[in-house]
Curated annotation (Swiss-Prot):
Keywords: Cytoplasm, One-carbon metabolism, Pyridoxal phosphate, Transferase. It catalyses: (6R)-5,10-methylene-5,6,7,8-tetrahydrofolate + glycine + H2O = (6S)-5,6,7,8-tetrahydrofolate + L-serine. This is Serine hydroxymethyltransferase, cytosolic. PANTHER family: SERINE HYDROXYMETHYLTRANSFERASE, SERINE HYDROXYMETHYLTRANSFERASE, MITOCHONDRIAL. The gene is SHM2. HAMAP family: SHMT (MF_00051). Belongs to the SHMT family. Interconversion of serine and glycine. The lineage of its organism: Eukaryota, Fungi, Dikarya, Ascomycota, Saccharomycotina. The modification N6-(pyridoxal phosphate)lysine is found at K248. Its main location: cytoplasm. It comes from Candida glabrata (strain ATCC 2001 / BCRC 20586 / JCM 3761 / NBRC 0622 / NRRL Y-65 / CBS 138) (Yeast). It is found in: Cytoplasm.
């Protein structure tokens, strides 16, 4: 049979991007060039591997597969089922748990939806949860709200009450958390962070959850790669549910996973009857059909590949170096006189206070971007505004992937110190009537040529390190 459509159509569906859409291809090339010639210090970012890219760009994205392996709402899913089952198997193996005690959903599309899907599975509207306060290092999806506004949609569906860090130490105040949890009696206690640099005491969190009758949910989105490698403690011994993204320290594609307990949850004190966990069906139902339709099968395949890599000695070597590089950040910043929230780090990142320097995170972030350093402004304990917060968050995973070591991270801190000093000088030069953030940015743009030599130095230096594409 002859091809029923035109030759132009055939060329459109079979031609490569360079032939069919050079405009988009050029933007992609520009972004690759930016990544190659920049220092990426955003703690939630990483550079994934070539084989993960190979799996992402496949015809698996053509297939609709609503439902779960063996129970789909569409035909033709024989191989999709194989991929999803393999991904689930590798997820359990990567985190050193067994299928008799744990199950995992690999269809959830991203971290914040994964958390919402867990809440909806286990709570009725307006039931209660507790999570770490956002300016103290928590995450929006743990129910953040201010006095005047519910910021996260989670806080409109459910009631949320934050716990805090000790303002003197920057460490979670577990004693106050316990007292408040016993009074508030949340249905879910969330142990997870986005800008908290110390290890969470999962054993203590488990004890608190038991005292108030809550499920303990651990959001390990930032640290899951470190957990898989076994270089920091695992939450699986203590948690009922564990959620994670897959593209941060785990170094996979953009996605998420929800792990849930199987087996016996408790034993009735009076009757001795065993009470099983009932998490698997509610969570799976919440993901599909509750919140999503068809899963992204190409992403699940790429995640399976990343999880295979996460179970290797080379991945443990990488995560060990991530911790060393984070310590290098800590040591060099402190040597240069900076204050770090919680006085340092146990993980992959540091949170640097800029209050003592007379500038804020938004201004330093802007200057850093002008010299090809990507980091992010971040709230620190005591902040009132997330738009002009008092700190910057700096992570080690991305540049460690590219092969940088401790001395390289010392050098990076010295670059940031130059950016901070430039921001200080620029801010102090502005008149009182025109010293807002927009005025600062305009002034930096006006004198950006002063930063050109430093930008060129960083541009050339970063090109020496490989970038998988």
């Amino acid at each position: 049979m002859p091809y029923a459509l035109s030759d132009k159509h055939l060329k459109m569906v079979s031609g490569h991007l360079s032939e069919t859409d050079p405009e988009v291809e050029q933007i992609i090339k520009d972004e690759v060039d930016r990544q190659k010639h920049s220092i990426d210090l955003i703690a939630s970012e990483n550079f994934t591997t070539t084989s993960v890219f190979d799996a992402l760009g496949t015809p698996l994205c053509n297939k609709y597969s609503e439902g779960y392996p063996g129970a789909r709402y569409y035909g033709g899913n024989e191989h999709i089922d194989r991929i999803e089952r393999l991904c689930q198997q590798r997820a359990l193996e990567a985190f050193h748990v067994t299928p008799d005690r744990w199950g995992v959903n690999v269809q959830t599309l991203s971290g914040s939806p994964a958390n919402l899907q867990v809440y909806q599975a286990l709570m009725k509207p307006h039931e209660r949860l507790m999570g770490l306060y956002l300016p103290d290092g928590g995450h929006l999806s743990h129910g953040y709200a201010t006095e005047n506004r519910k910021i996260s949609a989670v806080s409109t569906y459910f009631e949320s009450f934050p716990y805090r860090v000790n303002p003197e130490t920057g460490i979670i105040d577990y004693d106050t958390l316990e007292k408040n949890a016993i009074l508030y009696r949340p249905k879910i206690l969330v142990a997870g962070t986005s800008a908290y640099c110390r290890l969470i005491d999962y054993k203590r969190m488990r004890e608190i959850a038991d005292k108030c009758g809550a499920y303990l949910m651990v959001d390990m989105a930032h640290i899951s790669g470190l957990v898989a490698a076994g270089v920091i403690p695992s939450p699986f011994e203590y948690a009922d549910i564990v959620t994670t993204t897959t593209h941060k320290s785990l170094r996979g594609p953009r996605g998420a996973m929800i792990f849930f307990r199987r087996g016996i949850r408790s034993v009735n004190q009076k009757t001795g009857k065993e009470i099983p966990y009932d998490l698997e069906n509610p969570i799976n139902f919440s993901v599909f059909p509750g919140h999503q339709g068809g899963p992204h099968n190409h992403t699940i395949a790429a995640l399976a590949t990343a999880l295979k890599q996460a179970a290797t000695p080379e991945f443990k070597e990488y995560q060990t170096q991530v911790l060393k590089n984070a310590k290098a950040l800590e040591n060099e910043f402190q040597t240069l006189g900076y204050r770090l929230v919680s006085n340092g780090t146990d993980s992959h990142m540091v949170l640097v206070s800029l209050r003592e320097k007379g500038v804020d995170g938004a201004r330093v972030e802007y200057v850093c971007e002008k010299i090809n350093i990507a980091l992010n402004k971040n709230s620190i304990p005591g902040d009132k505004s997330a738009l002009v917060p008092g700190g910057v968050r700096i992570g080690a995973p991305a540049m460690t992937t590219r092969g940088m070591g401790e001395e390289d991270f010392h050098r990076i801190v010295r670059y940031i110190d130059q950016a901070v000093k430039f921001a200080e000088q620029t801010q102090s030069s502005l008149p009182k009537e025109a010293n807002k953030l927009k005025d600062f940015k305009a002034k930096v743009d006006e004198i950006a040529d002063q930063l050109a030599p430093l930008k060129k130095e960083i541009y050339d230096w970063t090109a020496e390190y490989p970038l998988a594409v």
